[in-house]
């Protein structure tokens, strides 16, 4: 099940701020233009090169910041989905959307997941983000991964204590990995998106691969 695919990550920041899909077009036109243009350019490149683009549905803007530009979380989420619909229409099978710890595009709430399924998005599932949203509940993480399984095309396998964004090596956090084998889409690709002290040393990623391999071999 260990396939290969080139995945381009859209720019994470502009002027020191996260490149949020929900950026307000009126109050921050430069960031809005950057979001749209960079995403559209990468999608075109992915089509030309038969590769993939990963776009974060959101990052982690404080709710207070979101509500300074939108009347409610729901209205901001509708803007996010509208823009993701646009990127989906351009990219088709060359674009995917990753979950965040923001209520604008998170996995773990069945109602939001149902909405995501209705929009037929191709998904990247970051396990640490889902675990944090679910406050470290392993049974709910498994249920979420099972619910979205058929639409997931790429995984970020990352451990976490489930309290904040810690990006831990597998086996160093609180995620129970063994039961997750049955709810992972076997056709999806994956990476171990672990925080590295030295970007030129991938030992923690390789250790995570070995940990998951051993865990899933014993799960039958």
Regions found by a protein language model. Name each.
Residues 17-123:
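Active-site acidic/histidine proton-transfer and metal-coordination neighborhood
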Residues 1-12:
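Glycine/small-residue-rich interface belts in oligomeric ring/scaffold proteins
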Residues 7-8, 54, 154:
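Intrinsically disordered, low-complexity regions enriched for glutamine and histidine
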Residues 16-19, 23-24, 32-43, 47-51, ...:
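Histidine-acidic metal/acid-base catalytic patches
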Residues 10-14, 57-61, 101, 161, ...:
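Short, flexible active-site-adjacent loop segments at beta-strand->alpha-helix junctions, enriched
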């Amino acid at each position: 099940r260990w396939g290969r695919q080139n995945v381009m990550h859209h720019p994470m920041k502009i002027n020191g701020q996260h490149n949020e899909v929900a950026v307000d077009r009126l109050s921050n036109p430069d960031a809005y233009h950057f979001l749209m243009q960079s995403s559209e350019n990468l999608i075109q490149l992915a089509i030309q090169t038969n590769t993939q683009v990963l776009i974060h549905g959101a990052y982690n803007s404080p709710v207070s910041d979101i509500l300074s530009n939108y009347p409610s979380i729901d209205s901001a989420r509708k803007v996010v989905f509208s823009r993701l619909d646009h990127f989906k229409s351009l990219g088709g099978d060359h674009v995917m959307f990753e979950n965040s710890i923001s209520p604008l595009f998170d996995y773990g709430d069945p109602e939001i997941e149902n909405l995501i399924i209705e929009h037929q998005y191709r998904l990247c599932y970051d396990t640490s983000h889902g675990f944090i949203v679910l406050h470290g509940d392993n049974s709910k993480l498994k249920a979420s991964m099972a619910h979205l399984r058929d639409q997931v095309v790429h995984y970020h396998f990352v451990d976490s204590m489930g309290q904040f964004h810690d990006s831990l090596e597998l086996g160093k956090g609180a995620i129970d990995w063994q039961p997750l084998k049955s709810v992972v889409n076997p056709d999806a690709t994956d990476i171990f998106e672990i925080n590295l002290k030295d970007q030129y040393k991938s030992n923690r990623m390789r250790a995570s691969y070995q940990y998951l391999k051993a865990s899933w071999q014993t799960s039958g």
